[in-house]
Amino acid sequence: MHPSFIRYARQSLSALLCAGAIFAAGCHSNNYTSGYGIAWVTLSETPAEFTSYTVNVDSVTLTGKTVGAYTIGGTAVETVDFTKLDKISELWSAASVPNDTYTSASIVLDYTSANISVMVNGVPTKATVVDSTGAAVTTQTINVTFDPTNTLTIQPTYASSSAVRLALNFDLAASSVVNMATSPPTVTVKPFMTAATSASDTKQIRVRGPLINSSVGVGSYTVYVRPFYDEINSLGSLTIFNDPNTTVYTIYGTTYVGSAGLAALLQTSAGTTMTAAYTNYQPSGTLNAAVTAGKFNSTFVLAGSTLEDYYTQGLEGDVTARNGNTLTLTGSTLQLNSGASQYNDAPAVVLLGPGTIVTADDNTTLTGLNYNSVSVGQHIIARGIYSLPASGVVTLDASSSTSTNQGSVRLVSTQLWGPLVSSASGSAVLNLQTIDHWPVSIYNFAGNGAAAVTPASYAVNTGSLAIPAGVAAGSPVWIDGVTTPFGSAPPDFNAFAINTEVSVPGRLQVDWSSTGTTAPFTTSTATGLTVDVSAASAAVIRIGSETIDLKAAGSVSPLIVPQTPPAGTAGLPAAFLPLFAIGNLTATAGTTAITAYNSFSAFVTQLPTSIVAATPALHIVAAGTYNRSTNTFTASSIDVVN
């Protein structure tokens, strides 16, 4: 029996408010006179150079025009490693919220037991964390005022539940100053978060929780929402919709597609089977034309022991060496079945064997996987029995095949980066620089092939994928996929996707010293901004592992333009809208005040009012994509810290 079921009876009443109403929001049934709607709260992050950034999210409180302050999710506290949210968002809650118009949100983060690590010469190193005064950090409060044209409105209705997404994003780059000159490094935190009713990214949303029920006929299943590694709190419930032809399921080590996967899920035990769905959010209408709701459509689902179970623990990380059936993992996270997690700065070990079940996430083409399918360079999530021997090395034995201790390994899509050396039909050679942001120098590829693997001529099987137009030898490329089986190289890697600089999400970041600047822009119009980097202490564009120094000789600061959102459906909220924000520390210690805008012109108009001598610009962080040929950075979000 899964511990989430054992502890179910101990959940607080506040965490279970109106579960029936929440289900109605997903299925567009009646909710009559509850006086509540739904706020689907998601968490994401804008990345920075951290190997871990673990803090507690203590609370999220909305301020309504009528009801005043209302805390979502009751007293539930979630421990979050925000570095794991660079490619996905997590559904934090599907909370019942009183009908009202909400104009702001207040998020409380607790740094008392924070685990924040940075990379020092390829080694994850735990940092000393301080606030702006140099003192140890405890709780920090971020108050965000919504765009006045896009407030969070839960409307009273008798036809169907009103439901709105609230997308929270933690900008790690704008929130932190890292001093690498100290030993260990020092991280000064001034948390910067945004909140909006439309996300400023198109990331998939992970929805985790124990199964309530499933229906092949309806094409859906329903879960209690338990984000991250939570085993106690149920933060509402949600119905997830399946594509009968394309949704990929991996359940107890077996892969299914579409309705067959839902039928297999139907055979599992409600309440004890843990699931995690990777979904796309789709705003939708209701029976009342004035009220909107939404759907979460799954592309990939994990369930049962493939995801987690009562008997085993998990270990996630990058395989940097393999000796026989012993894997060495760098930057690993231990996931205990109590709900606790632990980031490991030191290398950890996973033991494999013929009984280890191996699967590949969101993949139906890799067949015949076994314990020899795991090789150096692969990102994995393993399940097995955890121990901490006298050596002090975190060890996970995933070699067993018993019913109460089934070892398993999930192969997770891994990203290579480096200049292209050459290419031909079905193949490419890469001058490999990093794997999942780790420098190639930390990998010991011994055993991956009969001959030595050479990073400077790393062989990639591209299959039917074409090298993008305009890519020549020396051009940087980003390749996603999995490593080839242990001992089989070359090729060294099987590619699932090949991307170039112009299509990979990046970050433009400009920092000034503690005195800041009152003139951060050389141009500032309703169509674009150009940052004056001449007096900046640092100015870079980071695209994955690539760094472009904007202060280097001959560099020209790019024009930053807002991303144009795709055309939406009339009468429905947008699933994606760019977001632009400005904010600073207030006179109240540990409190940041931020104002968000979906309108770029409104944001630009506000900048000269906010950036003055008393509150100069300290950091500017834009997320988006960079076009080197036009020297243009197209921003889905811009955060200004002053």
List where the protein language model places each region.
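Bacterial N-terminal signal peptides that target proteins for export
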Residues: 2-16
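Alpha-helical scaffolds that organize eukaryotic protein assemblies
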Residues: 466-468
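Intrinsically disordered, low-complexity Ser/Thr- and acidic-rich flexible linkers and loops
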Residues: 337-341
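Long, polar low-complexity intrinsically disordered regions
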Residues: 450-452, 456-458
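C-terminal motif of bacterial Sec signal peptides marking the signal peptidase cleavage site
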Residues: 23-26
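A short, solvent-exposed, low-complexity linear motif enriched for acidic/polar residues
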Residues: 28-324, 330-335, 347, 354-360, ...
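Gly/Ser-centered flexible loop/linker motifs
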Residues: 459-463, 604
